[in-house]
Every structure is written in C-alpha cells, then in structure tokens.
Amino acid sequence: MSMSDPIADMLTRIRNGQMVEKVSVSMPSSKVKVAIAQVLKDEGYIDDFAVKAEGAKSELNIALKYYAGRPVIERIERVSKPGLRVYRGRNDIPQVMNGLGVAIVSTPKGVMTDRKARATGVGGEVICYVA
C-alpha cells in the first residue's frame, strides 16, 4: 500500500522515536527526506543520518539527539500537506518561536531553513516547523 504523505510519516517516526527514547529511527529514503535530514543535522536537531542502499530500495537511518536525557526536538509538525499545500513568498516566510525554532522550506534552490530562504530572497513550500 502506498503512503499518501511520506514526509509526515518521517516526522511521525522521529517524534515517536524520541518519545520512547530510541537511539535511531529508520524509514524508506527519498531525495526530499535526505534533504530534510540534512537541514535537521545542520541545525543541530539530530546527531547524524545515513542512507543505506539495498538494490532498488534505500533506507534512511536517523540518529536522534538528546540533551540531559530529554529530546532536543520539543515540537515537530507538518505544515504543508497533500490536501492543503502551504506556499509563502520571500516576504511571508514565518518565524517559529520568534526565531528560536526553524521552518523547513522547499524552494527552487533546494530545501533550506526559513532564515536561509529569507537571506537568499526566495519563497517556497513550508514543509514543517521544528522547535
């Protein structure tokens, strides 16, 4: 059975994995998921990630990050969904928790944070909020 929203599945696996204090979570890989994982790593929300290819299928493993026994990611939520896409222009990209969190945005120049999108001067689809 095909998944209707693989990105929401990725975010849910991360959220559930941190709730039960797992060291890592794995999921089917895609270019967008790898790009989101790279942004999460660059921003310090996850320790690391790796893509393991097995023939035609590839798997994305994400090493979750904790600080003082608590998950680093307090909140991670999907914004743009298959039934309701959310696009924002370069001047309308939202801030998460007044700049303490990040919004992950898919732009014509790739997947990036809200701060980088504003600095680059591009808008795009708001994928999720992370705090």
Swiss-Prot record:
Disulfide bonds: none annotated. Coiled coil: none annotated. GO terms for molecular function: rRNA binding; structural constituent of ribosome. It comes from the Bacteria. Pfam families: Ribosomal_S8. The keyword Disulfide bond does not apply. GO terms for biological process: translation. InterPro entries: Ribosomal_uS8 (IPR000630), Ribosomal_uS8_CS (IPR047863), Ribosomal_uS8_sf (IPR035987). GO terms for cellular component: ribonucleoprotein complex; ribosome. SUPFAM superfamilies: Ribosomal protein S8. Keywords: Ribonucleoprotein, Ribosomal protein, RNA-binding, rRNA-binding. One of the primary rRNA binding proteins, it binds directly to 16S rRNA central domain where it helps coordinate assembly of the platform of the 30S subunit. Part of the 30S ribosomal subunit. Contacts proteins S5 and S12. Belongs to the universal ribosomal protein uS8 family. This is Small ribosomal subunit protein uS8. It comes from Burkholderia lata (strain ATCC 17760 / DSM 23089 / LMG 22485 / NCIMB 9086 / R18194 / 383). The lineage of its organism: Bacteria, Pseudomonadati, Pseudomonadota, Betaproteobacteria, Burkholderiales.
